[in-house]
């Protein structure tokens, strides 16, 4: 869909997972891409919406610890990894999809690690679910006091769109959010232009190549 990303002022590379054995396998597969760098691991079915999101990403960048995760309060924490913290924000426990959660704080699918995560992922063994668990990566950092958690405010809306019901809820929310704020959410062309990764001329060229749609009409308003 996006090719090399050159047309957006970005650079993309691709690989694929031969077997679905869990999220930590991404570090194994992407070890050459990661190299000696720190990186973000984002799950494609997770959606974050809110003007303050950039502020929280800045907190991650300024963190002194090599591993950072986010937390959000949810009504059904048992559907995700649950994190428990004390009154000072120190991590007490992390459990993957517990039947009886001891907290309403869950860990959304956006993680930040240093290169050591590659070696951690190589040592992991499959859980009872038959998968490598991303929670075990968190716990490895945590036992070495190298993991921080950054709670997101209620102004940030998070959706796990892993099923059709949640996808519908998220889609309706995005529609109303865009109407209210007169903007586009998740428009890669608009982001590239606003970040000045591409010129106005290139932005217009990208828009002109799009098929006729409301999305195209809305993008034109930003030129």
Q: At which residue positions do the language-model features occur?
A:
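Short, amphipathic C-terminal "tail helix"
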Residues: 197-223
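Catalytic-core segments of class I nucleotidyltransferases/pyrophosphorylases
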Residues: 40, 54, 58-62, 87-197, ...
């Amino acid at each position: 869909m996006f090719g090399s990303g050159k047309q957006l002022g970005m650079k993309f590379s691709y690989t694929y997972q031969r077997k679905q054995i869990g999220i930590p396998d991404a570090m194994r597969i992407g070890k050459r891409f990661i190299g000696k760098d720190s990186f973000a691991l984002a799950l494609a079915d997770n959606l974050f919406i809110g003007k303050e999101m950039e502020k929280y990403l800045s907190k991650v960048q300024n963190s002194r610890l090599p591993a950072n995760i986010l937390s959000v309060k949810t009504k059904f924490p048992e559907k995700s990894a649950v994190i428990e913290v004390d009154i000072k924000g120190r991590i007490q426990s992390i459990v993957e999809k517990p039947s009886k959660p001891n907290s309403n704080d869950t860990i959304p699918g956006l993680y930040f690690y240093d290169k050591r995560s590659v070696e951690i992922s190589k040592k992991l063994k499959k859980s009872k679910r038959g998968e490598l668990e991303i929670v075990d990566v968190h716990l490895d950092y945590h036992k070495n006091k190298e993991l921080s958690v950054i709670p997101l405010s209620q102004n940030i809306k998070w959706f796990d769109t892993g099923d059709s019901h949640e996808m519908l809820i998220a889609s309706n929310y995005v529609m109303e959010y865009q109407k209210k704020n007169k903007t586009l959410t998740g428009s890669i062309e608009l982001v590239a232009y606003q970040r000045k990764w591409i010129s106005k001329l290139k932005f217009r060229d990208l828009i002109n190549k799009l098929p006729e749609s409301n999305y195209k009409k809305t993008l034109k308003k930003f030129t």
